[in-house]
Amino acid sequence: MNKPVNLIPPVTKSVRVARSQADAFRLYTESYGKWWPLKTHSIGGEKAVNAVMEPRKGGRIFEEWSDGTVHPYGEVLVWEPPHRVVHSWYVGHPPHEASEVELRFTAVSPRETRVELEHRNWETMSGDKAGEVRERYNNGWNTVFIDKFGSFAGKVEE
């Protein structure tokens, strides 16, 4: 099966954190609900009580609501601790329009890690909305990834 041709540039972000590579990977994947900003970036708004990434290939990424229901964000496609995780992403879109998010964790030193995010495959979205959605995520990942995850993991200013 052929991979989609990336005609729309991916969103890329990078943050350095004062954590070992293994710790940075673990904080991103296993502590997802501790740093994800549900109040501003969720499907359910006030109803959202947790965000979860099941730490394994095939694991679900989802939001839990106060009534116990689960609302999917995506699925873990590649699980390579502590180096890389790739997952589908279809928040607010049908699963067949999923984009893809890759996180790479590179040790800068034993106590510092560069975490790089690439959000790609916008072409899976139908109609003309892909470019607009990409721009929203370009801004959104600044808050979610750089600010929230970065602060949670001990962001190091470059």
What is each stretch, according to the model?
Residues 24-28, 61, 76, 87, ...:
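Hydrophobic pocket/interface hotspot
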Residues 52, 62-112, 120-123:
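Hydrophobic-ligand binding "helix-grip"
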Residues 17-19, 55, 78:
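Conserved strand-loop elements at the edges of beta-sheets that form or border functional pockets
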Residues 1-48:
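Hydrophobic ligand-binding cavity/cleft-lining segments
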Residues 121-158:
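A conserved amphipathic terminal alpha-helix motif
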Residues 13-17, 76, 103, 117-119, ...:
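A structural signal for short, well-ordered beta-strand segments
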Residues 7-9, 57, 68, 97:
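Residue-level preference for beta-strand/loop junctions
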Residues 31-71, 82, 158:
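Short beta-edge strand/loop motif at the mouth of beta-sheet-based domains
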